């Protein structure tokens, strides 16, 4: 079974269709009438708009003619260019467009059974975390008999015009589509997770390793059903659609339709002086202005391949507007890359995406307030929702996406479309269970852009450990809803931090409720003991307080280890010390290298300290070789840390 389906306006497609067939009438949607209010909020019309059904526009109308990806699309007189690009991208992956256009064969016109046609269609969108079905009639706006929004160059094909109408209904009207980015639209069509890559900032033309790493990510994304598109920045409006020296258009979005690592045969190795080539195939959704550089149809490289070579290598093109180019030229010519990962179907049972709905709310009590504003508001910043997740191993790429609820439907009331939003990421203690209240020792691991777009994201390779993500609006004291999604190749156990301190319970009251909270960061362990000169030392930390302990990752082959390991403990009394032990990880039996014992009283200095290691037995035990550098902070206010 698929995810639960929400019915927009509570309209049930099959019931409405059967009623129309029974009454021998065509459906007219009472919730999205063929009127100017369905077109614009207050914009002047460029001419008289007449709403027509497809059979009144052309002979033999169809939802889809042949292959959905075979025909070019046009944005129309009043249409939206990002919408056409998103349609072209959607058509690349059948698994996506058949979900957005459900039961497309059943919805198709059948000239043999005209009595079964009721002028009603349904489409599905991923709307703020829920798959939502939208029902529409087939009345489309025209001026002088021509569709004013998007249409296909196959003049009797209507899937994109009808899909665009359903999307406009979902968002309020056609004008609500203004300002949407191509990634906004693709995400709404597919539920994918979008990441925008700055090709120039990535320096892929200079850094060979990064270039092939990018290829690997794109290949994996595409073969798993993801959608990818790219564009060339235009510095100003005058250069929009201006052709480059190699035939590409500035400010124009191209869709990736294939990606291949091709091993060349013996004859071709001699021709191209390479054993393999990395290639991408792109499509111009408007079907004009193709690439004219290397590997284009007019290039020397292309001419050196026979038709049989191209077929065997997979260098084929299915329609006009498609072209191949090398990875090097791809990285050199395009500035922005939109990568939309298919995260709806976990691979091999692994949960790659975790998501949570949340909201910014206002309360006079600082511990209850959840609208503290951005990082600039230091006194209130942590009065925002907080989410913790765990990266189980070093070096995993984590993509974090924060989407605010779309307010376009309220535009008629004068409300803004979007607030300025963003988020901060902090590396925190390995055993943190409660909310952050002050940032004393936490590492600021990342920050998103703060901007008034619907979605902001951050992509980072993170070290092993716990991270707290704080989603914020730029200004404090405002309310709204948001959707937080985190994608990683390993489960990260995303959960919200809701409590400020340990709960009062019969159990902890009987044992003694905590009176002191202590935060410790062990920066390093240095000059550690070696029994003989060529011994390998692989140190790690064990930080203990009572029955609770935190263990650091192992540092390989060093007597000068940098840890920056954090822990936090809620203690009944300072009589329960904090013990930091250093161990050497060995194959059969780990070796104890020494420890320090700390009272960690609230009155103690909070600066960085260094202490020699000692044998077991407390702060007066015999000194051993080596010392640790650490910072410890204690407070009798359980909500200070």
From Swiss-Prot:
<keyword id="KW-0493">Microtubule</keyword>
<dbReference type="GO" id="GO:0004198">
    <property type="term" value="F:calcium-dependent cysteine-type endopeptidase activity"/>
</dbReference>
<dbReference type="GO" id="GO:0005737">
    <property type="term" value="C:cytoplasm"/>
</dbReference>
<dbReference type="Pfam" id="PF01067">
    <property type="entry name" value="Calpain_III"/>
</dbReference>
<dbReference type="InterPro" id="IPR038765">
    <property type="entry name" value="Papain-like_cys_pep_sf"/>
</dbReference>
<feature type="domain" description="Calpain catalytic">
    <location>
        <begin position="26"/>
        <end position="343"/>
    </location>
</feature>
<dbReference type="Pfam" id="PF00648">
    <property type="entry name" value="Peptidase_C2"/>
</dbReference>
<dbReference type="GO" id="GO:0008017">
    <property type="term" value="F:microtubule binding"/>
</dbReference>
<comment type="subunit">
    <text>Interacts (via domain III) with microtubules. Interacts (via domain II) with ARHGEF2 (via the N-terminal zinc finger).</text>
</comment>
<dbReference type="InterPro" id="IPR036213">
    <property type="entry name" value="Calpain_III_sf"/>
</dbReference>
<dbReference type="InterPro" id="IPR001300">
    <property type="entry name" value="Peptidase_C2_calpain_cat"/>
</dbReference>
<dbReference type="InterPro" id="IPR022682">
    <property type="entry name" value="Calpain_domain_III"/>
</dbReference>
<dbReference type="InterPro" id="IPR022684">
    <property type="entry name" value="Calpain_cysteine_protease"/>
</dbReference>
<dbReference type="GO" id="GO:0048471">
    <property type="term" value="C:perinuclear region of cytoplasm"/>
</dbReference>
<dbReference type="InterPro" id="IPR033883">
    <property type="entry name" value="C2_III"/>
</dbReference>
<dbReference type="GO" id="GO:0001578">
    <property type="term" value="P:microtubule bundle formation"/>
</dbReference>
<dbReference type="GO" id="GO:0005876">
    <property type="term" value="C:spindle microtubule"/>
</dbReference>
<dbReference type="InterPro" id="IPR033884">
    <property type="entry name" value="C2_Calpain"/>
</dbReference>
<dbReference type="InterPro" id="IPR022683">
    <property type="entry name" value="Calpain_III"/>
</dbReference>
<dbReference type="Pfam" id="PF00168">
    <property type="entry name" value="C2"/>
</dbReference>
<protein>
    <recommendedName>
        <fullName>Calpain-6</fullName>
    </recommendedName>
</protein>
<dbReference type="GO" id="GO:0051493">
    <property type="term" value="P:regulation of cytoskeleton organization"/>
</dbReference>
<feature type="region of interest" description="Domain III">
    <location>
        <begin position="344"/>
        <end position="495"/>
    </location>
</feature>
<feature type="domain" description="C2">
    <location>
        <begin position="498"/>
        <end position="621"/>
    </location>
</feature>
<dbReference type="InterPro" id="IPR000008">
    <property type="entry name" value="C2_dom"/>
</dbReference>
<comment type="similarity">
    <text>Belongs to the peptidase C2 family.</text>
</comment>
<keyword id="KW-0206">Cytoskeleton</keyword>
<keyword id="KW-0963">Cytoplasm</keyword>
<dbReference type="InterPro" id="IPR035892">
    <property type="entry name" value="C2_domain_sf"/>
</dbReference>
<comment type="function">
    <text>Microtubule-stabilizing protein that may be involved in the regulation of microtubule dynamics and cytoskeletal organization. May act as a regulator of RAC1 activity through interaction with ARHGEF2 to control lamellipodial formation and cell mobility. Does not seem to have protease activity as it has lost the active site residues.</text>
</comment>
């Amino acid at each position: 079974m698929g995810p639960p389906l929400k019915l927009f306006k509570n309209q049930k497609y099959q019931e409405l269709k059967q009623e129309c067939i029974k009454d021998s009438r065509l459906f007219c949607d009472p919730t999205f009438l063929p009127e100017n209010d369905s077109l614009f909020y207050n914009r002047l019309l460029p001419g008289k708009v007449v709403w027509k059904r497809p059979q009144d526009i052309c002979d033999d109308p169809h939802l889809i003619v042949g292959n959905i990806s075979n025909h070019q699309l046009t944005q129309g007189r009043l249409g939206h260019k990002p919408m056409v690009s998103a349609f072209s991208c959607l058509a690349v992956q059948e698994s996506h467009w058949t979900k957005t256009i459900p039961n497309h064969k059943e919805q198709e016109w059948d000239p043999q059974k005209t009595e079964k046609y009721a002028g009603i269609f349904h489409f599905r969108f991923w709307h703020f975390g829920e798959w939502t079905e939208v029902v529409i009639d087939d009345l489309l706006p025209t001026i002088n008999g021509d569709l004013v929004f998007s249409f296909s160059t196959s003049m009797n094909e209507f899937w994109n015009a009808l899909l665009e109408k359903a999307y406009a209904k979902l968002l309020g009207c056609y004008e609500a589509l203004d300002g949407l980015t191509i990634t906004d639209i693709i995400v709404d069509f597919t539920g994918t997770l979008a990441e925008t890559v700055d090709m120039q900032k990535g320096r892929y033309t200079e850094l060979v390793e990064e270039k092939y790493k990018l290829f690997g990510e794109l290949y994996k994304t595409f073969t798993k059903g993801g959608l990818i598109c790219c564009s060339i920045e235009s510095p100003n409006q005058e250069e929009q659609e201006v052709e480059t020296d190699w035939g590409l258009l500035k400010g124009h979005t191209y869709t990736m339709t294939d990606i291949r690592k091709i091993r060349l045969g013996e004859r071709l190795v001699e021709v191209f002086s390479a054993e393999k080539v990395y290639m991408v195939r792109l499509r111009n959704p408007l079907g004009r202005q193709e690439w004219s550089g290397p590997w284009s149809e007019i290039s020397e490289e292309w001419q050196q391949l026979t038709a049989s070579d191209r077929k065997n290598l997979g260098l084929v093109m299915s329609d006009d507007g498609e072209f191949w180019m090398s990875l090097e030229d791809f990285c050199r010519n395009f500035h922005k890359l939109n990568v939309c990962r298919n995260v709806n179907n976990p691979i091999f049972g692994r949960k790659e995406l975790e998501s949570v709905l949340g909201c910014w709310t206002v309360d006079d009590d600082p511990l209850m307030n959840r609208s503290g504003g951005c990082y600039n508001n230091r006194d209130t910043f942590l009065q925002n929702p907080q989410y913790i997740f765990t990266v189980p191993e070093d070096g995993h790429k984590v993509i974090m996406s924060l989407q605010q609820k779309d307010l376009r439907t309220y535009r008629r009331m004068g409300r803004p479309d979007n607030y300025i939003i963003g988020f901060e990421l902090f590396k925190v203690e390995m055993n943190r269970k409660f909310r952050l209240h002050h940032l004393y020792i936490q590492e600021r691991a990342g920050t998103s852009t703060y901007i008034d777009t619907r979605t902001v994201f951050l992509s980072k390779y993170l070290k092993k450990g716990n991270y707290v993500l704080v989603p914020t609006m730029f200004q404090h004291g405002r309310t709204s809803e948001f959707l937080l999604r985190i994608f990683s190749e390993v489960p990260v156990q995303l959960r919200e931090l809701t409590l400020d301190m340990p709960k009062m319970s019969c159990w902890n009251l009987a044992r003694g409720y905590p009176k002191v909270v202590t935060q410790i960061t062990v920066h390093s362990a240095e000059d550690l003991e070696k029994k003989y000169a060529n011994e390998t030392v692989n140190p790690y930390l064990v930080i203990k307080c009572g029955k609770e302990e935190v263990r650091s990752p192992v540092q390989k082959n060093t007597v000068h280890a940098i840890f920056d390991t954090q822990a936090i403990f809620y203690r009944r009394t300072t009589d329960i010390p904090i013990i930091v032990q250093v161990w050497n990880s060995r194959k059969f039996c780990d070796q104890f290298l020494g420890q320090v014992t700390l009272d960690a009283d609230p009155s103690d200095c909070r600066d960085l300290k260094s202490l020699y290691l000692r044998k077991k037995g407390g702060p007066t035990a015999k000194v051993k070789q080596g010392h640790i550098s650490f910072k410890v902070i204690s407070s009798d206010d359980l909500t200070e840390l």
